[in-house]
Every structure is written in C-alpha cells, then in structure tokens.
Amino acid sequence: PMPDDPILGLVSLYQADERPNKVNLGVGVYLNEAGKVPLLEVVEEAERRMTNRHQPRTYMPMSGLPAYCQAVQKLVLGKDHPAVAAGTIATVQTLGGTGALQLGAAFAHQFLGIQESVVSDPTWGNHIAIFKADGLSVGKYPYLSADRSAVDFDAMIKALKVLPPKTLVLLHGCCHNPTGLDLTHEEWREVAQVVAEKDLLPLIDMAYQGF
C-alpha cells in the first residue's frame, strides 16, 4: 500500500486522537472555536448571487473562467500594471494550488526543456514530490539563519547566483511555508535581478495572498 501523505496523514491521526484538548496545526483550514469550518459571509453572498442569476451551467473554456482569470491578474499584479492593460499575460485556472504547481512544473519540463529545480530549505513537502513527479531534479537553497529565527538572505542570494541557467527556482510570494518568514521589498528586487541576469525561471507559489 502507498504511504499516507505526510501532511494530510496528520488529519487522520488528529481525528483518531481522543484527547479533548487537542489542537490541529496541520492543514491550513480556517476553523471556528468549535473546531468547525464556518460558512463565511462572503461565500454565502457569492452563492446567493450566483443562484439568483439563473445562469446555465456549461463547460468552461480550456483556460478556465475568463472573469476569474482576469480578476486573478489584477489581484496579483494590480489593475494598473502595464502588462494587464496590454493583455500580454497568460492565465490558466487550475484545480487548486497543487494543480497549479503541477501544471507549471510540467510545462517548464516538457515545453521549455527545464531539467533542474531548486526549492527553499525548508519548504512545503509536496513541492519536492510534485517537481520530481514532473521529471525535474530537485535541489535546495538556504533560507533560514543558523538559529532558524530569520531569513538568511545573504546565503540565499549567494546560492541563487551560482545556479546554472534554465534552473526553475521555487519562490514563496508571501507567508513562506512553513516558516512564515518573508523577504523585504528590497530583497525581492535583488532576487528579481539575479533571476534575470542568470536566466533562471521563477515559479512563485502564492498560496497565502493577503497574509
């Protein structure tokens, strides 16, 4: 039998634990004080509006719902970004964040000829599994200081500077998983400069936009 997913498998262990004072710190799902997933008011309102429109349900375009894709572009880059106005961004709706990572890595490998990738040390465990499944080798670049209390940016940027061209670099856009420690705006500018100069391919995982 296949082993349990190292992250989602914790949910099964949590549910089997009979202690009343247990706390679930596994999968990042918002729970109320009763330990239940609440129906957020914004979700309830969105569902009400969709129901009241009485629109037919049919197949979406291959790239996803156009209005959703356009909204994502504006959310990520800002509605006034020149690339948004020029219509030069390609956006594809996927089955969740894992699906986006899988599609991005597969596209890079199959159509751009990317063979190597690097992820931060530490990173979300599934990053490595997804990239390997898509045929990429996976290395690591340093991210934390020796006492694991801050980002070791000097070590990180030094490692990025010696990567071979055409390496896929997994970066965490915000709320780094699992540390929560993020780069400053100035550090991001330096990373962008190195990525451009070294001809690297950045893949930015932005699972926690707004945090």
Task: List where the protein language model places each region.
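Conserved core of the PLP fold type I
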Residues: 49, 54-201, 210-211
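Conserved Walker B
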Residues: 206-207
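N-terminal "arm"/small-domain region of PLP-dependent enzymes with the aminotransferase-like
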Residues: 1-64, 71-74, 78
